[in-house]
Amino acid sequence: MGFNNLVSLAALIEKVFPIRYTPAGIPVLDIILKHESWQEENGQQCLVQLEIPARILGRQAEEWQYRQGVYVHVEGFLAQKSRRSLMPMLRIQNIQEYKG
């Protein structure tokens, strides 16, 4: 199946967890993103507020490990949080500071 799974989101880096490394030495950074916006749904304005766990791998993980409190624009895909949890986690493929 070739379903799309693409996420683009502007959010605040609410929390940054300590960086860790895979057995292969790849940096892994888990963060919590906080988003708030007004969206139109069924012709009505709707306030959307959410927090979502996210993960950054590789060189970008090291670059963002001290950036808590920064607004960012991220692009990535949703995946299960772990082998034992089907809760969603945003896997970030591209992250940049949000300039508004």
Curated annotation (Swiss-Prot):
<protein>
    <recommendedName>
        <fullName>Replication restart protein PriB</fullName>
    </recommendedName>
</protein>
<keyword id="KW-0235">DNA replication</keyword>
<comment type="similarity">
    <text>Belongs to the PriB family.</text>
</comment>
<dbReference type="GO" id="GO:0006269">
    <property type="term" value="P:DNA replication, synthesis of primer"/>
</dbReference>
<dbReference type="InterPro" id="IPR023646">
    <property type="entry name" value="Prisomal_replication_PriB"/>
</dbReference>
<keyword id="KW-0639">Primosome</keyword>
<comment type="subunit">
    <text>Homodimer. Interacts with PriA and DnaT. Component of the replication restart primosome. Primosome assembly occurs via a 'hand-off' mechanism. PriA binds to replication forks, subsequently PriB then DnaT bind; DnaT then displaces ssDNA to generate the helicase loading substrate.</text>
</comment>
<dbReference type="InterPro" id="IPR012340">
    <property type="entry name" value="NA-bd_OB-fold"/>
</dbReference>
<dbReference type="Pfam" id="PF22657">
    <property type="entry name" value="SSB_1"/>
</dbReference>
<dbReference type="GO" id="GO:0003697">
    <property type="term" value="F:single-stranded DNA binding"/>
</dbReference>
<keyword id="KW-0238">DNA-binding</keyword>
<comment type="function">
    <text>Involved in the restart of stalled replication forks, which reloads the replicative helicase on sites other than the origin of replication; the PriA-PriB pathway is the major replication restart pathway. During primosome assembly it facilitates complex formation between PriA and DnaT on DNA; stabilizes PriA on DNA. Stimulates the DNA unwinding activity of PriA helicase.</text>
</comment>
<dbReference type="GO" id="GO:1990077">
    <property type="term" value="C:primosome complex"/>
</dbReference>
<feature type="domain" description="SSB">
    <location>
        <begin position="1"/>
        <end position="99"/>
    </location>
</feature>
<dbReference type="InterPro" id="IPR000424">
    <property type="entry name" value="Primosome_PriB/ssb"/>
</dbReference>
